[in-house]
UniProtKB/Swiss-Prot annotation:
Gene3D superfamilies (alphabetical): 3.30.160.250
Matches recorded under InterPro entries: HicB-like (IPR031807), TA_system_antitoxin (IPR051404), TTHA1013/TTHA0281-like (IPR035069)
Cited PANTHER family: ANTITOXIN HICB
One GO process term, biological-process aspect: regulation of DNA-templated transcription
Family statement: Belongs to the UPF0150 family.
Highest taxon in the source lineage: Bacteria
Official protein name in the record: UPF0150 protein ssr1765
Organism: Synechocystis sp. (strain ATCC 27184 / PCC 6803 / Kazusa)
């Protein structure tokens, strides 16, 4: 049995506080990869697992794994 070496992937995730409590987490580079959690820590844990499963499914289907090319730039808008 051949063991495939693990690879590290780095992605930006965004977390939003929900109005009714908890957090919504998503990875913009991985379309449709979303999760949630009652706490910030739980949301981070859940989105990490969701990303792992997402990448594993891409690899299993011999699809390319997207590379992070997201640029995050905070803006100040004077209105």
């Amino acid at each position: 049995m051949t063991v495939t070496p693990k690879q590290i992937y780095n992605y930006t995730v965004l977390l939003e506080k929900e109005l009714d409590g908890g957090y919504h987490a998503f990875c913009p580079m991985l379309k449709g990869c979303h999760s949630q959690g009652d706490t910030f820590e739980e949301a981070i844990q859940n989105i990490t697992e969701a990303i792992e499963l997402y990448i594993e499914s891409l690899i299993a289907e011999h699809q390319p794994v997207p590379k992070e090319d997201l640029i995050v730039k905070p803006l100040s808008i004077l209105v």
